[in-house]
Structures are given as C-alpha cells and as structure tokens.
C-alpha cells in the first residue's frame, strides 16, 4: 500500500485520470523538456558519485553481461514481433530497440521507489543503465540499415548517432561530473540535483500519465501483442 501511495505513482494516476476525462491539463512542452534534461543529468551525477565510492573491478562482469543482454533482448523482440505479422519492419525495429534499451525515467522511478522502501542496490546501476542503452541502439540501427539495404553505413555514423543522442550524452556527462567532483566536494548543487529530484520527477510523471491515457486507444490497433 505504501508503494501505491508514493507521490510519483499518484501524480501519474492524476495525469492519467485528467487525460481520460479530456481535461485541458498539460505540462508546458518547454518545461517538460527542461525536466527531462534535469532528470537525465541528475541520474548521471548520482551514478558518478556512487561509482566513485564503489570498487571498479566489481563493475566489469555486470557491464559485459549488460552489453550482451541489450543485443539479445533487441534481436529477440524483433524476432517475436516479426512472427506476429502485425507490424511493419520499421515499426518492429523501433519497438524492439525500445525493449532492448531502458527508459531513464523508468529507471529514476524504480530507484526512487527502492530508496523509499530502504532497499539497497549496487552503486554502479547508473553505469549499467548507459551500457544497456548503447548495444540496443546500435543493434536497432544495424537492423534498420540491413532492412533498408543500407548495411554499408559507416560505423562512425552509427557511433555518432548513439553517443551524441541527448540521453546518452547527458547521462555519460553526468557520470563524469559526478565521479570527478564526488559528493562531499560538491555540496553547493546537492539541493538542486538531489533534494528536488523527486519533485521534478512527480511533475514529469504527471505528463506521462496524460500521454499514456491518450495512447491507450492504440492498443485497439495492435491488440495485446505488445
């Protein structure tokens, strides 16, 4: 019950109800984008600080496993979606890539929940978040290139597309900043990036609830396949 009454969940429910009731409630797009940037960089900074205090050797095996998992899940999802014959190739690749990677906001919600329940987790989880994103996107790009007969695309273009994307760039940048400064040396930003994090996350989930309610109708088109 405590988990259900978490403010993050309640804000999502409020947004979903507002959307279903056709309310004009919306988080302004410019502010929504700002919140997205804030959450991504905050996740990165927190992860960098936690990584600074963890044993680097203990991260190697989980990173390798995560990289393999990103490739396997993306290809498996693409295979399953193709077998349903309900999706165009481009749509199947896009959906499979999303399944293979991970939502940074979903990650933030889960971390917030674990902290509220006093459940411990490994310090390097933010690093794995980035590692899971990279192979999934690369696999998705390669699948799309092969599907469109553009398999000869330069590997440099693929790498650029992956690492210069907003999510990866901000999280990796945040990891570097967090690892460099450490928690005790950066108290001047703790309030903004740490103390206010859950409040901004609630506003983000409010908009996510609205968006989700508007996309429920899409289930009628694809059924329960997803």
Where on the chain are the PLM-derived regions?
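Alpha-helical transmembrane segments of multi-pass small-molecule/ion transporters
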Residues: 1-19, 26-30, 56-196, 200-208, ...
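Metallocofactor- and cofactor-centric catalytic cores in central/energy metabolism, strongly enriched
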Residues: 34-36, 42
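A beta-strand-loop signature enriched in Asp, Gly, Thr, and Trp
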Residues: 211-226
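Active-site-flanking structural segment that lines cofactor/substrate pockets
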Residues: 41-56
């Amino acid at each position: 019950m405590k988990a259900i009454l978490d403010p993050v969940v309640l804000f999502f429910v409020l947004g979903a109800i507002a959307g279903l009731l056709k309310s004009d409630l919306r988080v302004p797009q410019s502010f929504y984008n700002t919140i997205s940037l804030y959450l991504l960089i905050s996740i990165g900074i927190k992860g960098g600080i936690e990584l600074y205090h963890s044993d680097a050797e203990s991260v190697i095996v989980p990173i390798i496993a995560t990289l393999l998992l990103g490739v396997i899940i993306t290809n498996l999802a693409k295979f399953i979606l193709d077998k349903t014959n309900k999706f165009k190739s481009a749509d199947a690749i896009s959906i499979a890539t999303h399944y293979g990677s991970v939502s940074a906001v979903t990650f933030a919600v889960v971390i917030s929940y674990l902290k509220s329940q006093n459940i411990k987790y490994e310090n390097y989880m933010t690093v794995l978040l980035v590692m899971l994103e990279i192979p999934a996107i690369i696999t998705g790009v390669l699948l799309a290139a092969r599907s469109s007969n553009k398999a000869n695309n330069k590997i440099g273009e693929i790498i650029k597309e992956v690492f210069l994307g907003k999510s990866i760039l901000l999280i990796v940048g945040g990891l570097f900043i967090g690892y460099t400064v450490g928690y005790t040396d950066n108290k001047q930003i703790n309030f903004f990036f740490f103390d206010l994090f859950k409040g901004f996350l609630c506003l983000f989930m409010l908009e996510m609830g609205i968006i989700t309610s508007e996309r429920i109708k899409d289930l009628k088109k694809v059924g329960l396949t997803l």
